[in-house]
Each structure stands twice: as C-alpha cells, then as structure tokens.
Amino acid sequence: MKIDVITNAILDSCEPKIHPNVTLQILDDKTVIVVEIQPAPMRPYYIKSQGIVKGTYVRVAGTTRHVEEYMLKELILEGQNRYYDSEICKYLTEVHDNEIEKLCRDMKAIVIKNTLDESAKLAVRDITKNVLITWGVLKDVDGKILPTNAYALLTGQMLRQPVIQCAVFKGNTRAYFIDRREFDGPVQQQVEFAYQYVLEKINMGMHIKGIYRQDMYELPVDGIRELIANAVAHRSYLEPGNI
C-alpha cells in the first residue's frame, strides 16, 4: 500500500510524468523503501503545482536549489535534443563567403600548428563550408547559409563574447595580484593566448641527456593546453561570466 502511495504521489506531482521503481529492502533488520528513478531525456522535470520556473530544482553538492535561469534554458534545449552552440545565432542575420573562407583557413592553420609530425601536417585536409555545416557551425536553411552561436564564438562576434581571465597571485591565496591579463576575441585565439601566458609565468628547467639539452617546464605543457581547451569547450555559454 505504501509503495502505491509513493508511486502515485510522484506520478501526480511531477511533469513530465516520472515512472519510479519503488521497492522494499531489508537493511540492518529494518524495512527500507527504495525509490529508483532512471535518467530520462524529457528535461526538465519539475513540480507541477509550482510550474516549470519555480518548480525545477537541481542538486548542488549536498543541497537542493532552485535552478538558475541559464541552466533551465539549457535543460529545455537538451530535452528537445538541441544545444546552444548549434542554435542559429539571433543577431548575426547573414554570413559572407569570404568570412567563412577565412574561418576555414584559420582553423586549418591552428590544426597544422599543433601537429608535431611533418607527415601528419601534410595530411591535414582543407576545412570547407560543408565541413562547417556538418560540424553544426553553420546551418543550411532552405538553401540559405546561416551562422550558429558556435560560428559567433569562433569568429569573436558573440553579443557578450566571453573572455579568459588569467592571473598570478602572491602566495597561496588570491588576495594580492602580481599580474593579471584578459584575453578576448575568437575562443580558439583565447585558448592560444592563455596557454602562452601560462608558459610565460611558470618556471623552466632543463634536462641533459648525453650532449643534448632539453628545456622542460615545471608543469606538463600538454596538460596545460588540455586544461584550458576543456574549460572553453565544455563550459555552458548560456551561463553569464568568463573563464
């Protein structure tokens, strides 16, 4: 009976409908009600009586909080199998072929620059308009090429283009700045500038092997680049603020 009450309460209170698996288990000689709810794509799920804005909650560490506006938008897009970066940019009404070609050249140049093996550099293929469409950077709508939010980010034309903020602090706290820099422009350019900034600020040593000297940074440079790139690639651009 209790299981039916819990199941019906969840079904009646939530929207879209949630179908929980409610069971009884024995733990330390006590009967425990276990409620299992599998992840589902129809996000967001909210308390029906409170509405989608006030009734959507998220878990933050060990607390339950009302969802923030940007996160609610993100959940709605995910529930529709859509993503912010692949949405058509609302304030870039058109894009010209010369702008697309420049972005394609710039992106290929970045790939070649970060490819160490010479044979691999020669194997790098051209990036074309069709490739950008496949990636979701551009969209073909009834024969018209439209820019997405990803295109705006890659060309530095986002309405509130986020920036990367880098700083060096004195000691082990963030109370005093020794140096601070802010990098704007296209996101891929920001990654490169932030990477070079970190290399300027960390110590470099050397390793002698035989008659050869190899310069070595105190931190692994591949890890630094990946850390910065991941911060840019995996952040939510619906969330206001910088990196």
What are these regions (language model features)?
Residues 1-243:
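Conserved N-terminal catalytic/coupling substructures associated with nucleotide/phosphate chemistry
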